[in-house]
From Swiss-Prot:
The gene is rny. The keyword Transmembrane helix applies. SUPFAM superfamilies: HD-domain/PDEase-like. It comes from the Bacteria. One of its GO terms (cellular component) is plasma membrane. This is Ribonuclease Y.
Amino acid sequence: MSAKLTLESIAKTFAETSIFAILFLIIVILNLGLLVFLAYQYRVYKKKQRANLTKQTYNNDYGQIVNLKQQNGAKIKELANLKDQLSELGQKFNTTLSEIINKPLVNVIDEYLDEQFKQAANFREAELNAVLDSNDQKTVFHKRLFNKFHFGVDKLANINVKNPLNLCWVDSASFTVIESDFRKLNGVGGINKKLLIEKLRIEDIIFTNIDKKYYEVQILSDSPVKVQKTVLTIRNILINDYVDNEKIESYAREANGYFNDHCKLIGKQVLERLNIFEISPKLHKFFGLLAFRYSFGQNVLSHCLETGFLTAYLALLVNFKPDVALKCGLYHDIGKADDENGKKNHTVTGAKIGDEFYFENDVKYTIANHHNKNVDNVYCRLTQIGDKLSAGRLGARSDSSVLFSQLKQELKQIVEETLAQFKTTILLGQSGRRLVIWLETNQHNNIIDNQQLTDLATTIKSKIVQNNITNRFPIKVVLRYNFEHSFDTKDKN
């Protein structure tokens, strides 16, 4: 009986305990579920919070970028304005310097113009005032100004202007070296000479033994630029105690650098001598390059300087600004600096240079229009007269009439020596830069082919380059070969 009660009590106790255990497990599971739900909700909350923070940060960064862009745009505009102001200040500074440094401009110009020019250009004061006070508006002022004066370009055709070009800037194609320097330049078997010819792209380098100690070096090239580069390269080679093939090749490669520095020096010295203090070395280079450019036998830098002096003096006579007129004359052919072969339009090229260096409007207009017939700018008209005077005066296009005569005589002698077996007619252009040779023969046995004609042309060119008179300026030689060759279509009986 007692055992039965014990089992029942145990069963009852177990049943009660199981119920409590099940309830406990349910409570635990519910709590865990609640924790998981809370954890999930917290994670979702944090994710939204991070997303909002990222969006806010992005919006802030974007706003800062927009603000920086606006600020930079404003600063760029400020810099552009400052650049323009600096350019204006530079021009004013140059003008002020030209007034207070060295001699007054009128005195500088007086040094280069002779009395003949001043007398020919001496206007009558009463007529000058009459033109300036005229109310006739039908004719443009500058046309009335020059058409009504007793002043014609033809009266000034024979004026003399001192050549302001410093000849030491442009080295001669011929010079003398000692024997040790000759060996250094020639090298073993002429290897150094070949390297120089190849790298500098010149025709030849000729060494002539004067006596046992000295050699004459002659650079053959129709390009003054190549001659100058070769001279500068040789000069750098000779100042070294020892050179080998690699060093010579290195010097030849650096020839452009030597030449550019040389041009900058020329331009800087010329402009500063005229109280024009430009900031940019690039403009110095452009201006210095003109020392190695020729137009119909006339050195372009020398021509620009002459034109500048003449234009400035004319401006003084008619009460215009001589400093502006001087720049118009100096820079009117600046476009030729960037055109070694003469194939570009130098007025267009020059106008671009004027824009690049912020030239005054009158100067830019003159550069672009000095070859035009119809101009509406007084400084451009003055420059046209100065340009014509410089280019058209006696001997300007070949240094002198005497040199032109010598040039013609030397060319005639070269042609006659080379083409002795032909009847020849030669024509040398007035500028001295174009030589036309006609070959004539009626003899069948004197007929030559294209290769022989090419060989004759090469021989003539070599002699022209080697001659001290004919090699001063580039000359275009044209060979025209005309012959008569007759034959019968049927044999005569």
